[in-house]
Amino acid sequence: MAVRIHFTDDDLAQIRLAQAPDPMWEALLSMHMLQTDTASLVFGSWRNVVRHQLTRPTGELLRLAPPVGYSADFLTPAAGAGGLDAGIGALLSTPRQRLGHDLDELARAGRRLPSWARLLADGDKGAVTHLGRLHRHYFATALAPWWNRVRTRFDAERATHTRYLADGGLGGLLNTLHAGIAWRRPVLEITGLGIDRDVHLDGRGLLVLPSYFCWRHPTLLKDPTLPYVVVYPMAHETALSTAPGLRSLNALLGRTRAEILETVADGGVTTTELAHGTGVAAATASHHVGVLRKAGLLTTCRTGRAVLHTVTPLGLALLDGRA
């Protein structure tokens, strides 16, 4: 199964790489991570701090963003690209029809909604204001103290893919975003989402958005009529911890190879970037990549002047089983 995004010539001229992290998307996806215990290597310390500090009323916001399945589309308005104030302003201006539609979607999925959800679905001004207040408090608690780190990683990710665009054109950009994203002009195919769908942009263009809190697989809005965005996990510079699952992966692959597999899973990288990220010599990184490639966990391809390593479905399955 795959989501196939079909481009017209007009769409191809309107593919954009986001200029800055989107606080609304980071809020939504961090809510997902807060409700799981996966990816402790990257998010474990953050999760422990935020769970301790988050107030119960603000925690009700998480009911609109379950970690599996549908989350309310209205939580990530396109205006979030302009910053937190713009995003919350758009959230407060969400049409009543959109609020009702998205909350009905959650209810049909059997989600337990906050006590104020019915008022929100009716467009009650007090409930909408309450939603905006909770969202702002959530950002202040869960994201603001870490926002410089999010921005630094975003800038590095954007610089990397800007280089791929310059070296390999549109294919150089789209084919290096994530192992589950493939560009076969004029169709962008995204796998690993558990859905099968064809989306025709019809001149709307596409925003490509790296996300710090997006984990393992890309994500999309459910409603294909909204401004279209593909959100994908940005690369993380991580240090291995002593988490039980991670110790098992270390025992299976070895510490350095496990770290290389983790790094490559977040997006295509070069041998030099792997060497820098893992603290080993380029020749050593190249050797480990060769071993992982022979095991079917990684693949290597040339895009423009860059030779990129990406994780295979088998490699992702191994990591998913470990997470």
Where are these regions (language model features)?
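Long, low-complexity, charge-rich intrinsically disordered regions
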Residues: T55-P57, L62-R63, L75-P77, G192-A235
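Extended mid-to-C-terminal alpha-helical interaction segments
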Residues: L207-A323
